[in-house]
Structure formats: C-alpha cells, structure tokens
Amino acid sequence: MKNIAIVGLSSFGFYLCRKLSAMNYNIMTIDIKEELVNQVKPYVRKAVIGDAKDKAFLQKLGITDFETVIVSVGNKIDSSILITLYLKELKIKEIIAKAVNEDHAKILDRVGATKIVFPERDIAIRMAHTIDNPNFLEYIPVDEDISLIEIGVPSKWVGKALSELNLRSKYGIQIVIIKELIPPRVTVPTGDFILKDSDILTVIGTNTQIKEIQHKLD
C-alpha cells in the first residue's frame, strides 16, 4: 500500500485526501490550522497539526517514510517553495506541488518538485471549453495540441458501425472508449461496434480536429 503525505489542507488538498483515502491509500495530512486537521481526521490514517516550513518538524514526523508528498498550501507561494526545497533535501522520491502561476511553477521545478499541477487553471480551461460547446460533456487537454473530449453520439452516427463512419480517415480523430448505458459498461471499441444514442464517446484528436468535430455537432 502506497504511503502519501499531503501538506496543506486547502480545498484541493482536502478533496484530494478524501479521494485517495477512498482508494485505499495510506494518507497522512499536515496543516497548521487545527480546524482543517479536525475536518479531515475521519478520512485519513494520520492528521497532524504543525508547521511544514520547519524542516526539523518534518524529519521528526517521519516524512521520509512516504514515497509521495503533495504540497498543497493554497496561495502561499513562499511556503510552498520552502516546503518543496526541504522535501528535496530530505530525498523524497516524488514531490507533487501545486502552483498558482508559471513563475511559481518554474521556482518549484528548480527547488525539486518532480511534478507540478495547476488545478484552478486546468478546471477553468475545461469549463471554458464545455461552455463554448455544450455538446462536450467533458474536455481534457492532453498537451498543448492534443485533447480528449466526451460527447454524446451525434444523431447521424446512431446505428452505424465505427468502421463505416471511418472517423480517423475523415476527421483524424479516434474513439478510444465508449461508455454504454444499456447495459452499463465501459468498452474499448472495435470497428464493428454499432453506436447507440445512449452511448458516451471518449474521443482523442488534435485541437484543430476537435474544433472540426465541434462544428459537425452544432
């Protein structure tokens, strides 16, 4: 069982620890605010009140027993940088740090973060795309040029096999997963899969190709 420590119980840290605990990870949380620590106690193996900016405190706590440490200290840029530096000095294998902007991310990278996340930015981007096109049930950027989207089955595609639609040749996109509601299951489809109006498609393509599909769905 993987041991994960979460430093900082911002909204991001709080919901992350609840989800990881539900997935049966051993979670320890650290925050300087007692009320936040008390809120998370029912969900984690260990919840500690303390200042993670104190390197000696981290050592005494046994932070080196954790393979992964997630730094989620809200918008406290100086705190997250210092904590990340200490974790690097303590030879934590995986340090995932939350950044609030690109400059913050650059510094986190330099002081030792192995992965940097932008939860607010990423949620805003996804929401903007789903607002821009209500046909997109979900939008997930893979990198700067490639995205995943979830869409319902367009009426023109219902009752047709994927091989007949030939989406890759026509539009350059590929359906990688289909969520079926009747019966409920998730399928990695083959060319002979017949689309139903109740299916939900996970589609991958370049942003240009996704934009073209967007116009087809309007």
Regions found by a protein language model. Give the residues of each.
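Cytosolic regulatory regions of ion transport systems
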Residues: 1-218
